[in-house]
């Protein structure tokens, strides 16, 4: 009986280590993908210009105004008329991001760029909300400073069954080094 208890304790004590190593592998794979495949275009002029233009436009916007825009976005998701959503999806940055997603051959499930307040500047496809400023993807990148990366836990997508994660990266103005926004990339781990 002592042997069984000891064996059970040993087995249970290994579980967190196994999970930790699995998480480390997931994070390491995504970091490699970011460095090799994403960084080369993260400072593309279309991204930097779009973020800076929106930052200037929304500089004096209150959180109340931002929440109103987010609510407007959420309401339009289920509506036939989507003027606000369509305007964002028709932006040159959104088309650029959609092309990057398409070029990834299924590895990238979504891309969206956020401004200095956490609002979407451009996106490859429809997101469930417009304001990310209250979420870790923006808070753990933009607020943390240049080169900040936040890799979320891996989850099974309920609609596709694919194992996915999101990686978010602070975006800096190459001319000044100032953090101006962030990008979130949905990554299909089964394709990585």
Region roles according to the model:
Residues 25-127:
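Extracytoplasmic/periplasmic sensory segments of membrane signal-transduction proteins
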Residues 17-22:
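Sec/Tat signal peptide C-region and signal peptidase I cleavage site
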Residues 162-192:
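Conserved beta-strands of PAS-like sensory domains
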Residues 1-8:
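Bacterial N-terminal signal peptides that target proteins for export
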Residues 8-16:
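Hydrophobic helical h-region of N-terminal Sec-dependent signal peptides
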Residues 82-98, 126-155:
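Extracytoplasmic/periplasmic sensor domains and loops in membrane signaling proteins
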Residues 127-129, 142, 156-157, 169-176, ...:
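Glycine- and small hydrophobic-enriched segments that form the cores of compact globular domains
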Residues 107-109, 146-148, 181:
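Loop/turn elements at helix/coil->beta-strand transitions in domains of secreted/extracellular proteins
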